[in-house]
Amino acid sequence: MLFRSVEYKSKYGSGEPTDVMIDALLEDFRQGDYKRIIAIGGGAVIDMAKILVLDGEAKAESYYRKEVPLRKVRTLLAVPTTCGAGSEVSNVSITEITSIHSKLGLAVDEIYADEAVLIPELLRELPYEFFATSAIDAFIHAIESFVSPKANLYTEDRKS
């Protein structure tokens, strides 16, 4: 039997992710037995979904502070709906920890998406202003990969 569930970020809040939003999502999520996460949205949605691939019963803050073992137990398919965040190809998730009024980042290989699917039609529905700013963001990320002191063989090969 195929079991599926759809959770909407708007149910948990809007804007940039917070630990409170992720904890509410985790509470609902842990009531099921999911093998795969499909995150369709911008960077905030994908960043929140990255935490869902991890094992355990911890609160969001414990994951971001690395107070618990970080073990990936689910696959993540990321489908971005903007063109600038890059969350679908990074191992980083950022959230605000409300108790300290500050953002924390988690950068570990366990939260890389297993697959990223780019669907150009999803960008057609973006308001022009949002499309333009996210496209500029994507362009800046591309430049950054060339000038970064952490450039790698992939980006170095593209310079010639």
Positions of PLM-derived features:
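Conserved beta-strand segments of alpha/beta enzyme cores
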Residues: 4-6, 75
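Glycine/threonine-rich beta-strand-loop-alpha-helix active-site module
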Residues: 20-27, 31-120
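Carboxylate- and glycine-rich phosphate/diphosphate-binding segment that chelates Mg2+/Mn2+
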Residues: 95-159
